């Protein structure tokens, strides 16, 4: 049998008592971390989310309580009363904030017993993630995870405080809405009342926040759940949280300034880190040119260099033919790394192949300044000199080359840049480098669909100076979109929106969405745009990713209380599950087994 709580109430947490509290009578409640018996005296590390305090059961102080304590096991929930005393000098633990004291217990209540846990409740855990997620209620007792969840709460409060002070309104938008094309699959919810019709869970509140701007609420925000039925990675979840913002009568500069202040506030509140403002800004074109990708990690160099103009007439036909076909030849100089072995080079070649590179050429600069490489013989001395100057090549350097169409060349070398930085330990994990990437292309061409698709979403405004290209050269139309990138991870993105019905219809038409389809899917927006729409824009931060980086975790699953697996399942509750036949009948749904 367990004890009832009765009128026992906690006076302190397990992380707050110090030597200044000696001789104080206290009541603590929490979990048994571990138990030790020494010469008949029982010592217990007693834990709650605030910390650990050592409690002591001495048979000479209270034999009855001591006898009861002998039944205690790990993860039992206890309530204890006792007196704070100094630890003996040889038992002081300077690694614990409570390490100078212990509680001499004279009253004990066993509030709940526990079976042997599936794993030890410690930060150094050997259990697999599958086991941890199945027993998430135990996993969440670990100090590190509890600190992450508390940091998430602190970040959320900081966001609300900052935006409230700037006159933003926290306005809720619907979860049951209609399906719109936003790049990923929607989660559909069948309507019981309207048979054969479905709601969609929102991938973002995009259209509703634009409606709020049209309605006159000129500063809006939400910390809101969003849903996307997509293939998952370490930084993706089917349901995720974003900080969603929108403002009227603003341009890019004002939005960036406000959001930089928001991020500065969050970092100060959660990590006591003072960020320098403003953040660096580069265009999309510059990011691709220098780093190969649109989410560059700015904590290290290893920038890409374009050699196409130097090799278009070289004797090395692999390079020359690529340039003549409109491709690119680019290179990275890994300074001082000519000691790379053949095995290491082969590993990097295989890595580049993941991103469709057909090969990875390389050149080592020997101590005498000459080239060591299978391709060295194809270049004249003048060509070598020009390449050396362009790449700042010196003895003991190794240079890696990729030659292919622009997309493959940039992507493969951009990812290789990150891989080299990891291997060479160039990344300082205690450094936070932010950069805005601006002026993204408005659209890209989807070869499978044989039509243009919006890079961000269909409501992003084009740059005014590129409007005339919308009909004739849409791939070269730049947008008023911007992403915030932190340490190579996109944590937020937004844009100035289209606030003209005519321009919105024109952009939709460019995307292959004719008037009839546009009215069917976006008629409410198009009608609203004609009601007097202020210029407006905003952005959304991936809150889970932001907290992941703040907590220096590798996966957002470690900063979400109850995350899904990479197969979008909840191992704790075994969701998703089959619906009862009666439920399906109410919804007029029949499940058909499809053989894969």
From Swiss-Prot:
Belongs to the class-II aminoacyl-tRNA synthetase family. Type 1 subfamily. Keywords: Aminoacyl-tRNA synthetase, ATP-binding, Cytoplasm, Ligase, Nucleotide-binding, Protein biosynthesis. Aspartyl-tRNA synthetase with relaxed tRNA specificity since it is able to aspartylate not only its cognate tRNA(Asp) but also tRNA(Asn). Reaction proceeds in two steps: L-aspartate is first activated by ATP to form Asp-AMP and then transferred to the acceptor end of tRNA(Asp/Asn). ATP binds at residues 228-230, 237, 490, 542-545. The gene is aspS. Residues 206-209 are annotated as: Aspartate. It comes from Desulforapulum autotrophicum (strain ATCC 43914 / DSM 3382 / VKM B-1955 / HRM2) (Desulfobacterium autotrophicum). Transmembrane segments: none annotated. Its EC number is 6.1.1.23. GO terms for biological process: aspartyl-tRNA aminoacylation. It is an enzyme of class 6 (ligase). Gene3D superfamilies: Bira Bifunctional Protein, Domain 2, GAD-like domain, Nucleic acid-binding proteins. It is found in: Cytoplasm. Homodimer. InterPro entries: Aa-tRNA-synt_II, aa-tRNA-synth_II, aa-tRNA-synth_II/BPL/LPL, Asp-tRNA-ligase_1, Asp-tRNA-ligase_1_N, Asp/Asn-tRNA-synth_IIb, AspRS_core, GAD-like_sf. L-aspartate binds at residues 182, 228, 456, 497. It catalyses: tRNA(Asx) + L-aspartate + ATP = L-aspartyl-tRNA(Asx) + AMP + diphosphate. PANTHER family: ASPARTATE--TRNA LIGASE, MITOCHONDRIAL, ASPARTYL/LYSYL-TRNA SYNTHETASE. Its main location: cytoplasm. GO terms for cellular component: cytoplasm. This is Aspartate--tRNA(Asp/Asn) ligase. Pfam families: GAD, tRNA-synt_2, tRNA_anti-codon. CDD domains: AspRS_core, EcAspRS_like_N. GO terms for molecular function: aspartate-tRNA ligase activity; aspartate-tRNA(Asn) ligase activity; ATP binding; nucleic acid binding.
